[in-house]
C-alpha cells in the first residue's frame, strides 16, 4: 500500500561496489470530490462518514482502501452479503474519488425439483423478489417459510452469479401429498372411538389442503369435509371452509342424578378467514350456518331445533412446548359470537368466552398450571349452545358436561410432578359454577373439586387414570388412552 503516495519508483545506479538507490515518489493529490453511485439502501451522507479524509486533505490510498472495506462491512452486517465495490478509482489529476457500489440486486429466482407444486405457490413464500437487494435475513426466512408448508422433505438454496448479479436457485424435494391417518382412543365417558382422515395436502399444486375426516364411536360421530389455504394470493391471510355433520349422545343430570339421555345432531357450513398478528396470535372471523336438532332418547331431556347464523371473532395464542404434558408456555382462547335474525337465523344471542392457562416448570420436575375461564351469554341461547362444566379436563368429580348454563366462571390450579421419564403424577383444585341468569350469581354457589391422577406418555398417546371428588359428594374415576380428537 502506497499510503499518501500515488506512485513510487526505485532506480539502482553506480558500480558494483558502490551501488545507490534513488526513489522517485509522486504524492497523492488533495481530495477534491467524492462521488458514490449505486446506493439505494443507505443515506449517502451516512456512508460518507466512513471515509476519514475530508475535502482539501491529501488522499491516503491505504486509508482509502480500509474505508472502502468498512463501507462493505456495513452492508454485510445488515444482511446484504452480496454487496461489492464494483468500481473504486482515484483521479490523480483532479483528486476526485469515484465509488460505485453493486448492492447485489437479484437477477432472478428459479425453483427446481418440484413436479406437482406450482412454482408461484413456492415463490410466494419467499419475501424476496427479482430486483430486490439480496438480503440474507429475508432469504433465510423465505427458506423456512417454504419448509414450514410441510410440502417438502428438503429445501436448499444455491446462489449463482449472472452479469454480476446474484441468481437464486431454490431446490426442493417434495413429500407425497396424499396422506391417510388412522387413530383410536378410549375413555370412560364415550368408550372406544376411531378416526379416519384422508388428506390431499397439495391440491392442484397450490399448497391448499382438502381433508375428509370421520370420527366414529358409541356415543359420538363426526363427518367433516374441509378445505384450507394458508395463503390468499401473496398475503399472509388464511382461510378455510368446511361442511360437517356431528352426532353426539349426551346425558342429562339433575344435580348428581342422571335423569335422561338425548341425541344432538348438528349439520352446517363454516367459513373462516384470519391471520397471525403479533401478541394476538391467530385472529380469525368465522361465519357459521348451522342447524341443531336435539332428540330425547330416554328419560327427561330437552328437545327441539335451532337454526343458527352467527359471526365469531376469535384470538388464539398457543405456544406450549409440547403435547401432551406441556412444561412451559401458555394457551389463550378468547372469542365473541353474535347470532341474530339479521344474519338469517331464528335465534338471537351473544356469547363471549375467555380461557387463559399458563405452564411453568421449576427445578425441571415440578410444573404449575393456573387456569381461568369466563363465559357470558345473553339472549335466546339454545340448550346446545350453553356452556358446560364437568369432566377430567374441566372439573374433577363430575361427568362430562354434567352442568350447563349461560354464565360460566371457573378457575383451577394444577400441580404436576415428573416422577420418571414419561411418567407424571398430578393433583388439581377446581372452583367454578354455572348460572342461567346474571342475577342468579352468588359466591356461595361456587362448586369445589379436587383430584389426583397418574399419566404416562406412550407411543399411542397419553394413558391417564384420575380420581376426583367435588361438592355435594360427587366422586368419579376417569380413565383414557390416546390423543383427543
Residue ranges of model-derived segments:
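Extracellular/lumenal ectodomain signal focusing on beta-strand-rich modules
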Residues: 33, 87, 108, 154-156, ...
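A short alpha/beta connector and helix-capping loop motif
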Residues: 440-453
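Post-signal-peptide, soluble extracytosolic/periplasmic N-terminal scaffold domains
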Residues: 1-101, 116, 120, 126-129, ...
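Gram-negative/organellar outer-membrane beta-barrel architecture
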Residues: 41-45, 62, 70, 116-120, ...
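Short, charged/polar, Gly/Pro-enriched secondary-structure boundary elements
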Residues: 27-34, 103-109, 174-182, 232-234
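A generic beta-sheet turn/junction motif
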Residues: 14-16, 27-29, 92, 115, ...
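C-terminal outer-membrane beta-barrel translocator/porin domains of Gram-negative envelope proteins
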Residues: 179-182, 300-437, 481-484
